[in-house]
Swiss-Prot record:
<comment type="pathway">
    <text>Nucleotide-sugar biosynthesis; ADP-L-glycero-beta-D-manno-heptose biosynthesis; ADP-L-glycero-beta-D-manno-heptose from D-glycero-beta-D-manno-heptose 7-phosphate: step 3/4.</text>
</comment>
<dbReference type="GO" id="GO:0033785">
    <property type="term" value="F:heptose 7-phosphate kinase activity"/>
</dbReference>
<comment type="subunit">
    <text>Homodimer.</text>
</comment>
<dbReference type="GO" id="GO:0033786">
    <property type="term" value="F:heptose-1-phosphate adenylyltransferase activity"/>
</dbReference>
<keyword id="KW-0448">Lipopolysaccharide biosynthesis</keyword>
<dbReference type="InterPro" id="IPR004821">
    <property type="entry name" value="Cyt_trans-like"/>
</dbReference>
<feature type="region of interest" description="Ribokinase">
    <location>
        <begin position="1"/>
        <end position="318"/>
    </location>
</feature>
<keyword id="KW-0067">ATP-binding</keyword>
<dbReference type="InterPro" id="IPR011611">
    <property type="entry name" value="PfkB_dom"/>
</dbReference>
<dbReference type="GO" id="GO:0097171">
    <property type="term" value="P:ADP-L-glycero-beta-D-manno-heptose biosynthetic process"/>
</dbReference>
<protein>
    <recommendedName>
        <fullName>Bifunctional protein HldE</fullName>
        <ecNumber>2.7.1.167</ecNumber>
        <ecNumber>2.7.7.70</ecNumber>
    </recommendedName>
</protein>
<dbReference type="GO" id="GO:0005524">
    <property type="term" value="F:ATP binding"/>
</dbReference>
<comment type="function">
    <text>Catalyzes the ADP transfer from ATP to D-glycero-beta-D-manno-heptose 1-phosphate, yielding ADP-D-glycero-beta-D-manno-heptose.</text>
</comment>
<comment type="similarity">
    <text>In the C-terminal section; belongs to the cytidylyltransferase family.</text>
</comment>
<dbReference type="GO" id="GO:0009244">
    <property type="term" value="P:lipopolysaccharide core region biosynthetic process"/>
</dbReference>
<dbReference type="Pfam" id="PF01467">
    <property type="entry name" value="CTP_transf_like"/>
</dbReference>
<comment type="pathway">
    <text>Nucleotide-sugar biosynthesis; ADP-L-glycero-beta-D-manno-heptose biosynthesis; ADP-L-glycero-beta-D-manno-heptose from D-glycero-beta-D-manno-heptose 7-phosphate: step 1/4.</text>
</comment>
Amino acid sequence: MKMTLPDFHCAEVLVVGDVMLDRYWYGPTSRISPEAPVPVVKVNTIEERPGGAANVAMNIAALGANSHLIGLTGIDDAAHALSEKLRSVKVRCDFVSVPTHPTVTKLRVLSRNQQLIRLDFEEGFDNVDAQPMFERIEQALPHIGALVLSDYAKGALSQVQEMIKLANAAKVPVLIDPKGNDFERYRGATLLTPNLSEFEAVVGHCKDDNELVEKGTRLVKGLDLQALLITRSEQGMSLLSVDQPPLHLPTQAQEVFDVTGAGDTVIGVLATAIAAGKPLNEACFLANAAAGVVVGKLGTSTVSPIELENAIRGRAETGFGVMTEFQLKQAVVDARQRGERVVMTNGCFDILHAGHVSYLENARRLGDRLIVAVNSDASTKRLKGESRPVNPLEQRMIVLSALGAVDWVVPFEEDTPQRLIADVLPDVLVKGGDYKPEEIAGSEEVWAAGGDVKVLNFEDGISTTNIIKAIKNQ
């Protein structure tokens, strides 16, 4: 089973918001200035990239979709540079020129892959007449599959409620990357994509996943949204919807060089996937994979379809990820030939939470490779009751396979994985909870083959049951 990319070429997305130009000055530094205790950078490279809403539009175009951008600029060299850069990558620019204001520009000075300083050139557009933007939006709405409102608090979205109403009237999904702590102004949007600090600035600190789900669900209902996607840095993303259980996606970033523009990539890929026909949960999975790619690059960057394809398929194509039993057995044989110690655990993993992640990380530390065997939907229903599983097998396995601690994910139909364990014969069999080792399914077979059986504790107070109760109490 593999996640597939949609046909992005059939998607058309409109981006409206605060456009800006990101300028980068690069050079070596080898001495301190005699004028002040600051490094001296000898600039040898100058680079210009579209930023803010323009970076969102770039991300959409990079996927091969039709990207249309509306924003406010000055009449200056920065506006010209911005237009030229965007048109060169097939972004359709529809700027409203404001002669009294400069184009928002951010200048970053970097040396040895480190940002030393940022200089901002800007003047807010809050009091600029919004009617020309409304007219452009109305003309575009009949032709698009999604509208992105990219808010950097520079004034282009000072009349954001009117824009939301226009999109809702046209039945076009409107996705917003919010700014500030007044989320009331985004009432009626389809989805907001705040980062964790932006979210907690509105609802208060969340001590755990349960509280995050509770407060986020309340916010979704209170603002008449359809969903909320909270980006959580090294903790991945959490999708909270009106009529669906929470979906927690672990980060896929291998190395983080620069988070500049990562939020633009998330909302750009999310909107494009939705416009191309993907359901929200799959669109979020693609956005999460794209974020993992882009933070490994320096500066505002985009993700190509090939990079995204590699991000979602790379592990499976190199012998990792979701597998059939036949594929798993061969992968285990190959691992043992490399001298690797194989660990195996199992469970329903219906709503993945921090307790699960911690448990799986601890299990992985017992060896070199970790297998997670997952109960099928029918098996989960027999064990947990008619209301379960909340998430279907395919989604549960996709989320598990994205965890860095997990190497192989395989489904099984029985109530216990005893047959599967007997076939695989892991070096270490692990189970979470208060079991005795001899009570664990497959323990006798593993011991007979010379393996170990371990019991690990779960984190107290975190459980799927508690999360479900929190949702029902809303």
